[in-house]
Curated annotation (Swiss-Prot):
Catalytic activity field: [GlcNAc-(1->4)-Mur2Ac(oyl-L-Ala-gamma-D-Glu-L-Lys-D-Ala-D-Ala)](n)-di-trans,octa-cis-undecaprenyl diphosphate + beta-D-GlcNAc-(1->4)-Mur2Ac(oyl-L-Ala-gamma-D-Glu-L-Lys-D-Ala-D-Ala)-di-trans,octa-cis-undecaprenyl diphosphate = [GlcNAc-(1->4)-Mur2Ac(oyl-L-Ala-gamma-D-Glu-L-Lys-D-Ala-D-Ala)](n+1)-di-trans,octa-cis-undecaprenyl diphosphate + di-trans,octa-cis-undecaprenyl diphosphate + H(+)
Protein EC: 2.4.99.28
Gene name linked to the record: mtgA
Identification of the protein by name: Biosynthetic peptidoglycan transglycosylase
Annotated metabolic or biological route of this protein: Cell wall biogenesis; peptidoglycan biosynthesis
PANTHER family per the UniProt record, alphabetical: BIOSYNTHETIC PEPTIDOGLYCAN TRANSGLYCOSYLASE, MONOFUNCTIONAL BIOSYNTHETIC PEPTIDOGLYCAN TRANSGLYCOSYLASE
Length: 242
């Protein structure tokens, strides 16, 4: 019969082996994600994690469903849309390194107060880079693990890609309605024009829709949307874009 000391030693070895295996898998996964970040620094994506998730959802009801999506390069997206989106989602986009911890803290405190009052409206503290990480690589699910991976990816993206490329990717994979992805598809879906020809008011309204695009696709004339559009129209000229 093995001695207690020997049994404890065997258990220690097993636990150590399991921990090392988990660490190796985690490191390999991060290396894989980093390789994808490098790939998309130079290659345009044909789809994204959020697109694939949404297409699967739509095809549960309609097997023939397709997404509206068309990639366009940075110089074929109007500066008005770039300004409006930065003003709406991340006014300090050109200055931070991917994550704004103060914004995350304020959003968390606000959401805690909302929850205590029984209110469902929450505020996000994610930068454009974080949103890109989620849209391109992850999913819409909410968990601490996914949020942690989003933060890691945001730093990877910022260290590999210039700001112009980050914004180009974001504008092309952002969700803008039911099955509508990217600036070009959004411009054609709502205004029957191209992303390059969007006016200031049109761009501001599209930017205002970003926090809840499926809802605003079905409710295009709410008081909040009109008010937010007016606010962004005033603010957008004051932000810096790459």
């Amino acid at each position: 019969m093995p001695k207690p000391t020997a049994r404890r030693l065997n258990w220690f070895r097993v636990i150590t082996a399991v921990i090392m295996a988990v660490l190796c898998i985690a490191i390999l996964y991060q290396l894989w994600m980093f390789s994808l970040v490098v790939w998309y620094a130079y290659r345009d994506p044909g789809s994204s994690a959020i697109m694939r998730q949404e297409l699967a959802r739509l095809r549960e009801r309609d097997p023939e469903a397709e997404l509206k999506y068309q990639w366009v390069p940075y110089d074929r997206i109007s500066n008005t849309l770039k300004q409006a989106v930065v003003a709406s989602e991340d006014a300090n986009f050109t200055e931070h390194d991917g994550v704004e911890w103060d914004a995350i803290r304020k959003a968390w405190e606000y959401n805690q107060r909302q929850a205590e009052r029984g209110r469902t409206k929450m505020r996000g503290g994610s930068t454009i880079t974080q949103q890109l990480a989620k849209n391109l690589f992850l999913s819409g699910s909410r968990s601490y693990l996914r949020k942690g991976q989003e933060l890691v990816l945001a730093y990877m993206i910022e260290h590999v890609m210039p700001k112009e490329r980050i914004l180009e990717l974001y504008l092309n994979v952002a969700e803008w309605g039911v099955g509508v992805f990217g600036a070009e598809a959004a411009a054609r879906h709502y205004y029957n024009t191209s992303a390059a020809r969007l006016g200031a008011g049109q761009a501001a309204r599209l930017a205002a829709m970003l926090p809840n695009p499926r809802y605003y696709d079905r409710h295009r004339n709410t008081g909040y949307l009109n008010s937010r559009t007016a606010t962004l129209t005033r603010r957008m000229r004051m932000v810096e874009i790459p």
